[in-house]
Amino acid sequence: MEYEFLLDVTGLVTSRFSMDHEAIGQWLNEEVKGDLAVIDKIASALAEIKGSERQWQLVGHEYTLLMDDEEVMVRANQLEFETDSMEEGMSYYDKESLAFCGTKDFIDMLADYRDFILQKYDW
């Protein structure tokens, strides 16, 4: 999973992710928006489910984060397609709507995101 964090012209933190993980970047941009309390909530939830078979989810306005001890899924809340009406050979581009990654990679990315934000504000 490759990613980078940037400041846009208005000073807001934005993220870009590699093709198979674009939904994670969109989730950060739309749901987290630099709010470290959200990252703390996720880290706390992961500590609670670690070593168990339980899942935890965080439903946002545009995206939902679902995680268990081993994997994280980010999906757009509107990710429902009717495939009956599609022409043969056609498929939807959903890379910005659905992404999976390992929990460790996700937590490492969130730590990098936190560091970027803290450097931005010199806290």
From Swiss-Prot:
Transmembrane spans: none
InterPro entries: UPF0231
Family, per entry: Belongs to the UPF0231 family.
Protein name: UPF0231 protein plu3616
Organism encoding this protein: Photorhabdus laumondii subsp. laumondii (strain DSM 15139 / CIP 105565 / TT01)
